[in-house]
């Protein structure tokens, strides 16, 4: 029986309040409206961003809410005006979008869509501001326009990347956020040449994605920098050739790296959000050609300073959002990198849990035990 145009009742993991375990509830998911797509989610994974907003320590809490933004699924139905997607398509919902009409979308240099740029405070859909989720008639808020901790979700079509139907969704679902953020920061923004050296600041999931990018690019040395030495053995699996813990040195880490590399690395990628690490990442690149890329998100009031001579000596500092990938245009190509065995995804997946045990995924991340935990829907 077709569910097109009908309300679908399904299970979702609802966050009723900040920091409390998610509760599996039966929710009603309304049909997609104009420029929207309803997706059956098959696999989702937990990102640190989900945990950050679930804890709600640094922002206005918005509850009850359905979190989740790294996922893979199949289109169930499409709303009015959707022409590039149809039922049965294999897709990745993305936390940011590509309307295809704004100046950013028309620019080859930008992926910062005016309409669908990431918005953490919006609890409804762009079309009408309303939620497509409800329990007993009461709305449940969306998260990042994706809300993938639900067996069915409704997403703006501009936030949906159509991918190769042969790609295993339980693997490629992790491409839709953190991994691509790090990978693209290296491949698309830092752009190391084969044989060059790259320093990665922060060896969490995003930093390991950046290291994977350096490995794919053919970097000869990939130097990982982290305060947690327990991460070093794992980092070697991602192509990191040597690791440095700033706590082990009595001089600034940028000086340590400069001494290790005859004047500085060719490229650096900062993945922590620490202002101190941003300064270090910039000042550790070689003069004349060095490029540093900032990925980590700082606190709201943060600022940093560095001597202008660092720029005049031809060091370059760049920032990036989502690895400079346009969601609909570029993410299918990242999936193809996996399909042709250029990109290795399995090593990022450390745990798998059934949907009924989704809170275990939060435990693994809070304890620092996981890179990515796959949550199998319908299990």
From Swiss-Prot:
EC number: 1.1.1.1
PROSITE patterns: ADH_ZINC (PS00059)
Main location group: cytoplasm
Amino acids binding an alcohol: 49, 69
Catalytic activity: a primary alcohol + NAD(+) = an aldehyde + NADH + H(+); a secondary alcohol + NAD(+) = a ketone + NADH + H(+); ethanol + NAD(+) = acetaldehyde + NADH + H(+)
Disruption phenotype: Loss of alcohol dehydrogenase activity. Increased resistance to allyl alcohol. Decreased survival, associated with impaired lateral roots development, upon oxygen deprivation leading to hypoxic conditions. Impaired root acclimation to hypoxic stress.
Keyword annotations from UniProtKB, A to Z: Acetylation, Cytoplasm, Glutathionylation, Metal-binding, NAD, Nucleotide-binding, Oxidoreductase, Phosphoprotein, Zinc
Domain of life assignment: Eukaryota
Regulation: Alcohol dehydrogenase activity show inverse correlation with the decreasing availability of oxygen. Slightly repressed by thiol-modifying agents N-ethylmaleimide (NEM) and 5,5-dithio-bis-(2-nitrobenzoic acid) (DTNB), as well as by methyl methanethiosulfonate (MMTS) in a dose-dependent manner. Inhibited by hydrogen peroxide H(2)O(2).
Binding site for Zn(2+) 2: 99, 102, 105, 113
Cofactor, how bound (note): Binds 2 Zn(2+) ions per subunit.
Single annotated GO MF: protein homodimerization activity
InterPro entries: ADH-like_C, ADH-like_N, ADH_Zn_CS, GroES-like_sf, NAD(P)-bd_dom_sf
Binding sites annotated in the UniProt record for Zn(2+) 1: 47, 50, 69-70, 177
Sites bearing Phosphoserine, chain numbering: 229
Assembly and interaction partners: Homodimer.
Other comment: Unlike most plants, Arabidopsis contains only one gene for ADH.
Family: Belongs to the zinc-containing alcohol dehydrogenase family. Class-P subfamily.
Function: Alcohol dehydrogenase catalyzing the reduction of toxic aldehydes to the corresponding alcohols. Mostly active on ethanol (EtOH), but exhibits broad substrate selectivity for primary and secondary alcohols (e.g. cinnamyl alcohol, octanol, geraniol, butanol, propyl alcohol, pentanol, isopentanol, ethylene glycol, isopropanol, methanol and tertiary butyl alcohol). Also catalyzes the reverse reaction to convert allyl alcohol to highly toxic acryl-aldehyde. Required for survival and acclimation in hypoxic conditions, especially in roots.
Protein name: Alcohol dehydrogenase class-P
Organism: Arabidopsis thaliana (Mouse-ear cress)
Underlying gene: ADH1
């Amino acid at each position: 029986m077709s569910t097109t145009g009908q309300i679908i009742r399904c299970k979702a993991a609802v966050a009723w309040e900040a920091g409390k375990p998610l509760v599996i509830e039966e929710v009603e998911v309304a049909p997609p409206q104009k420029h929207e797509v309803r997706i059956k989610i098959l696999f989702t994974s937990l990102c640190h961003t989900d945990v950050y907003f679930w804890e709600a320590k640094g922002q206005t809490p918005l509850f009850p809410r359905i979190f989740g933004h790294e996922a893979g699924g199949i289109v169930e139905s499409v709303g009015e005006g959707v022409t590039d997607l149809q039922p049965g398509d294999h897709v990745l919902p993305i936390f940011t979008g590509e309307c295809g009409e704004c100046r950013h979308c028309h620019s080859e240099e930008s992926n910062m869509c005016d309409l669908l740029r990431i918005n953490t405070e919006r609890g409804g859909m762009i079309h009408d501001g309303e939620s497509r989720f409800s329990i007993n008639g009461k709305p449940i808020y969306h998260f990042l326009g994706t809300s993938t901790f639900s067996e069915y979700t409704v997403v703006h079509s501009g936030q949906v990347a159509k991918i190769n139907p042969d790609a295993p969704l339980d693997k490629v679902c992790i491409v839709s956020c953190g991994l691509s953020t790090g990978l693209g920061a290296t491949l698309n923004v830092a752009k190391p040449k084969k044989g060059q050296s790259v320093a990665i600041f922060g060896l969490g999931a995003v930093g390991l994605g950046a290291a994977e990018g350096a490995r794919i690019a053919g970097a000869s040395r990939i130097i990982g920098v982290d305060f947690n030495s327990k991460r070093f053995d794992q980092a070697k699996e991602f192509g990191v050739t040597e690791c440095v813990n700033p706590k082990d040195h009595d001089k600034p880490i940028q000086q340590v790296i400069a001494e290790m590399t005859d004047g500085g690395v060719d490229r650096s990628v900062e993945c922590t959000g620490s202002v101190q690490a941003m300064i270090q990442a910039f000042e550790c690149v070689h003069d004349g050609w060095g490029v540093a890329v900032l990925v980590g998100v700082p606190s709201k009031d943060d600022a940093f300073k560095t001597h202008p001579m660092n720029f005049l000596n031809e060091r370059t500092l760049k920032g990036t959002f989502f690895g400079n990938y346009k969601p609909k245009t570029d993410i299918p190509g990242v999936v193809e990198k996996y399909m042709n065995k250029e990109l290795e995804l399995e090593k990022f997946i450390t745990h798998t849990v059934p949907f009924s045990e989704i809170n275990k995924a939060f435990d693994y991340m809070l304890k620092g035990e996981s890179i990515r935990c796959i949550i199998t829907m319908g299990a």
